[in-house]
């Protein structure tokens, strides 16, 4: 690879690091081209899966201000640069690794810090953002309904008391 090509590759990878909300570093030794294509399809639009030379990736990470990943860049390494929701991409990679034992998750990077294998797996086990928001909305709706009931209870009791007094007064006047 010519020096100019290397500089361009480093700049491209550094840009991907800067634009990514998270990255997942994997080892792909033993996967076929068809397997890699299948993994890229499973990631969809939320992430790009890139295979690059470790030396170029290390330089790009340093250029992008990413620290703590150098020890992950050994052997055949590929990186998933996540532009969307990190949970969705981590789920897709974990599911693919479960089916294809040749894919090994090495770690990742998110919100300014390196992630261990266990942390990437925990992110993959989280529910998606939409599901969590729906659960939160459901919990809030239930609590708001209870609060409304508590606030309306005294007013309805006063209304029932007034109606009972009115009926009693009407009954006394009729008698």
From Swiss-Prot:
Pfam families found in the cross-reference section: Ribosomal_L10
Keyword field contains Ribosomal protein: yes
Keyword terms: Ribonucleoprotein, Ribosomal protein, RNA-binding, rRNA-binding
GO process annotations (BP): translation
Coiled coil: none
One MF term in the entry's GO annotations: large ribosomal subunit rRNA binding
The UniProt record lists the keyword Ribonucleoprotein: yes
CDD domains given in the database record: Ribosomal_L10
GO cellular component, one term: large ribosomal subunit
Biological role: Forms part of the ribosomal stalk, playing a central role in the interaction of the ribosome with GTP-bound translation factors.
PANTHER family cross-referenced by the UniProt entry: 39S RIBOSOMAL PROTEIN L10, MITOCHONDRIAL
Subunit structure: Part of the ribosomal stalk of the 50S ribosomal subunit. The N-terminus interacts with L11 and the large rRNA to form the base of the stalk. The C-terminus forms an elongated spine to which L12 dimers bind in a sequential fashion forming a multimeric L10(L12)X complex.
Family: Belongs to the universal ribosomal protein uL10 family.
Protein name: Large ribosomal subunit protein uL10
Organism: Mycobacterium sp. (strain JLS)
């Amino acid at each position: 690879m010519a020096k100019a090509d290397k500089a361009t590759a480093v700049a491209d990878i550094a840009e991907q690091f800067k634009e990514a909300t998270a990255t997942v570093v994997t080892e792909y030794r033993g996967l076929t081209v068809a397997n890699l294509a299948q993994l890229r399809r499973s990631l969809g639009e939320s992430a790009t899966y890139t295979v690059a030379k470790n030396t170029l990736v290390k330089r790009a990470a340093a250029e992008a201000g990413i620290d703590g990943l150098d020890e992950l860049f050994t052997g055949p390494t590929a990186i998933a640069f996540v532009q969307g929701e990190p949970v969705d991409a981590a789920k897709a990679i974990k599911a693919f690794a479960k089916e294809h034992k040749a894919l090994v998750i090495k770690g990742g990077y998110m919100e300014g810090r390196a992630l261990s294998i266990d942390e990437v797996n925990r992110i993959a086990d989280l529910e998606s953002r939409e599901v969590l928001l729906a659960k939160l909305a459901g919990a809030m709706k239930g609590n708001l309904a209870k609060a409304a009931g508590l606030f309306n209870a005294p007013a309805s009791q006063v209304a029932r008391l007034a109606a009972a007094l009115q009926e009693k007064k009407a009954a006394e006047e009729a008698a």
